[in-house]
Amino acid sequence: MGPPMKIEDVRRTAYSMPLTNPAFPPGPYRFFDREYFIITYRTDPEALATIVPEPLEVAEPLVKYEFIRMPDSTGFGDYTETGQVIPVRFKGEEGGYTHAMYLDDEAPIAGGRELWGFPKKLARPKIEVESDVLVGSLHYGSVLCASATMGYKHHKVDHDTVLKSMASPNFILKIIPHVDGSPRICELVRFHLDDVVLKEAWTGPAALGLFPHALCDVARLPVREVISALHFKADLTLGLGSVAFDYMAK
């Protein structure tokens, strides 16, 4: 048995919950062979306007629907993720706003929500190769909510183009409630991907279907036209964030 826990001990060791056995370890968080499958599509401008918060501005009526396979990550392990990222501008700088994410692993859900403010929910995303097709799917429970396909490795993509897009800032709306349910933290968080090593990048013909669901509303941003598709692998570090805008500041 150790000594009794003092107030100073709580302040010194507090990081995540449970206090003595946190749901995720401290970073840095390095990802190896992180696999992306991204379909960029055109959607309704009116739908985007109801979702993207000020002071962000919608750059174009586009959405990037992303599937990400993470077989080897420090602290977070082996998992798959999917979600929607919206191209935006913040003070004249172009970046991406992460609107919603769905994944299958507790540690990155807890860490993502608590540290950065990622809008993560538990679901069953999947990436796999079926014969000559790259397939991405999202099930929420037993219900199919998203289905994406792409011709497998048809054409190489210029690495500089992909690296430039990965260097852009990313934005998230972090919300942590007070004990009475009112917002205690409400911030626009900015983060970057660091130390990126791009291993391969491909494109091909693609299709995307989004289907209505009450609690997994990816179809709220409907697909009007598929613009492009991208499939690539990289090693990278998920950098910690900074506060770009504080909604609670007077």
Swiss-Prot record:
Signal peptide: none annotated. Keywords: Decarboxylase, Lyase, Schiff base. Its EC number is 4.1.1.4. It is an enzyme of class 4 (lyase). InterPro entries: Acetoacetate_decarboxylase (IPR010451), Acetoacetate_decarboxylase_bac (IPR023653), ADC_dom_sf (IPR023375). It holds the Pfam family ADC. GO terms for molecular function: acetoacetate decarboxylase activity. The active site is at residue 120. It catalyses: acetoacetate + H(+) = acetone + CO2. Belongs to the ADC family. Catalyzes the conversion of acetoacetate to acetone and carbon dioxide. NCBIfam families: PRK02265.1. This is Acetoacetate decarboxylase 1. It comes from Bradyrhizobium diazoefficiens (strain JCM 10833 / BCRC 13528 / IAM 13628 / NBRC 14792 / USDA 110). The lineage of its organism: Bacteria, Pseudomonadati, Pseudomonadota, Alphaproteobacteria, Hyphomicrobiales.
